[in-house]
Amino acid sequence: MAVRMGTAEQPACICDIGKMTDFHATRRLNWLGYGACAAAGCLWGAGFYFGKLALREMGVGHMVLYRFLFASLGMLPVLFVAGRPKGSPRWTNWTRRETGTLLLSSALGIPIQFLLQFEGLAHTTVSHAALMVGTMPVLLALGATLFAGERLDWIGWLALTGSTVGAALIVLGGGQAGIPGNVPTFAGDMLVVLSLVIALGWILMNKSLMQVHSPLAVTAYGILSGTVMLVLWVVAVNGPPPMEHVSLTAWMALAASGVLCTAATTLLWNWGIHHVPASRAGVFLNIEPALGSWLGVQLLGDKLGPFAWVGGGLILAAAVTLTARGHEADPEVLLE
């Protein structure tokens, strides 16, 4: 509906109320999207801390398995609404290609990524692992350059170089852990970085699936199918998970890491990047390394060496520089 406004002295203007309403609705979704990404970053920041608590009483495979069993419980209510478009009683059909992409994404993003990542955590400190995660925004930019045809300007390449140097300083800088017998190692740090490279494929494939299916559907089906793969692998390799002699602290840490740091964060992040440009939402990934390293220092007594502090600063500076700069909005995301 259009309304004519003006006087004889002042030219009239045509204001499309429908377009104004759409504009305000889009802006509200943008802010909600940014809020969802920020909340996901905060919850992700606690993931290594909860994981370290659980690793005191069980191995990596069983810890990751319990984490995703709890995450799957949190996703079950979502599953019943995820596959049905709004107002439709029928489930959305997935093509064979989309199903294959989902299964490959789930394999990369859950059993492969998390087993590698927490195997790395078992051989390094929470603070080191968290700071290594700070390289993720730069890896996202590099992945977009290599696989999505985007161009990385000189500032982007400078940020990539700074992030790489920062990671090297963290590895070489050493430090001490608050948990006796657990010190940062080169192998542990590199396993965390390798898991991030694998996570890049998971993120890019999820992004492509969300152009066709809802974030809820991609998240629910991805976590549940990945958990099935994880159960088969862990039980075959490590045997059944322990049930006895597990403390209440470990159970609470496992439940929190599954429901809050996995199910809730994935839902929040996937919904958030569906409504804002991923390039801008990436700045909230910086919350995870900052909060995670702080938790390691404050709650577990980790001590970072001077080179590690400098390296962490370089990583965070590179990530903020790359993600906080102005970008053109992605219309497919903003106008969905």
Model-derived regions: residue spans:
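Glycine-/small-residue-enriched transmembrane alpha-helix faces in small-molecule transporters
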Residues: 3-66, 178-208, 228-232, 333-336
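Hydrophobic alpha-helical transmembrane segments of multi-pass integral membrane proteins
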Residues: 31-36, 62-82, 104, 157-169, ...
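Helix-helix packing/entry segments at the starts of transmembrane helices
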Residues: 41, 64-66, 128-135, 204-228, ...
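Hydrophobic transmembrane alpha-helices of multi-pass small-molecule transport proteins
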Residues: 75, 143, 152-175, 230, ...
